């Protein structure tokens, strides 16, 4: 059984930055450091940060006064920011800059009074944070996930309408929803550049290119990771059996029956150490040749806040 590794895979610049912010805050200020929501959606990463002294909470009322709090890579609503400010909490913002870009687009629409449509998954922290950027009561902010949602959508003024997207969606499915929006609301305006982030796009492209070369695909990532779920769905869509796994312990030998080539990729919040443990386990189960499939090189870097830069 050959093992083919997708490229690029694993950590993106936004995840690297978010983890570095938590690690640097712990190094500079000591534990505990409070983090609102999982800083990235990966169980291994969160557990390692917990061991180092990070305390993960879902709401700010769980954070004691005079504490340091970090906002997760998924971003937060304006209301959360205002609450942190009113309590004089020291905040470090680990929101991915590409999510912040979407927040600014929604903020501009709110300020102008334009209505806005967000393409995204209800309940996802990024979606909650993005919806929470819109404050204009005279306008409106709407969430859609499918072309069927678009068909049922009613807005106040279809002539003054824009759309944005969650950054971690399926490129193909998002394109279908955008097409539906443009058909239903011919004057709708979109962002100058697609909101789906470069890392999401690149990892999906790598899976699409590789899926025809393998019989099965393992996606390393946690179940609450949106981009990891989209990778598994895409692999299945293009014809490979696909499994989403947190780590090597979840691999079942039955999955490999009759498999001559297996692909391995990792979501943007999954560290390379987990990929290497998967390779080790696959070797134990009969894997032989390990090859890196060529892919797009990534050199994007997002800096941590100046106060947290360790010299």
UniProtKB/Swiss-Prot annotation:
GO biological process, one term: isopentenyl diphosphate biosynthetic process, methylerythritol 4-phosphate pathway
Disulfide bonding pattern of the chain: none
Pfam families registered for this protein in UniProt: LYTB
A Gene Ontology molecular function term of the record: metal ion binding
Binding site for (2E)-4-hydroxy-3-methylbut-2-enyl diphosphate: 41, 74, 124, 167, 225-227, 269
Catalysed reactions, as listed in the record: isopentenyl diphosphate + 2 oxidized [2Fe-2S]-[ferredoxin] + H2O = (2E)-4-hydroxy-3-methylbut-2-enyl diphosphate + 2 reduced [2Fe-2S]-[ferredoxin] + 2 H(+); dimethylallyl diphosphate + 2 oxidized [2Fe-2S]-[ferredoxin] + H2O = (2E)-4-hydroxy-3-methylbut-2-enyl diphosphate + 2 reduced [2Fe-2S]-[ferredoxin] + 2 H(+)
Keyword Iron attached: yes
Record-listed isopentenyl diphosphate binding positions: 41, 74, 124, 225-227, 269
Pathway: Isoprenoid biosynthesis; dimethylallyl diphosphate biosynthesis; dimethylallyl diphosphate from (2E)-4-hydroxy-3-methylbutenyl diphosphate: step 1/1; Isoprenoid biosynthesis; isopentenyl diphosphate biosynthesis via DXP pathway; isopentenyl diphosphate from 1-deoxy-D-xylulose 5-phosphate: step 6/6
Active site: 126 (proton donor)
Domain of life, source organism: Bacteria
Cofactor section: [4Fe-4S] cluster
Cofactor note: Binds 1 [4Fe-4S] cluster per subunit.
Record has Iron as a keyword: yes
Entry EC number(s): 1.17.7.4
Alphabetically ordered keywords of this record: 4Fe-4S, Iron, Iron-sulfur, Isoprene biosynthesis, Metal-binding, Oxidoreductase
Binding, [4Fe-4S] cluster: 12, 96, 197
Binding positions (dimethylallyl diphosphate): 41, 74, 124, 225-227, 269
Family: Belongs to the IspH family.
Its job: Catalyzes the conversion of 1-hydroxy-2-methyl-2-(E)-butenyl 4-diphosphate (HMBPP) into a mixture of isopentenyl diphosphate (IPP) and dimethylallyl diphosphate (DMAPP). Acts in the terminal step of the DOXP/MEP pathway for isoprenoid precursor biosynthesis.
The protein's name in its UniProt record: 4-hydroxy-3-methylbut-2-enyl diphosphate reductase
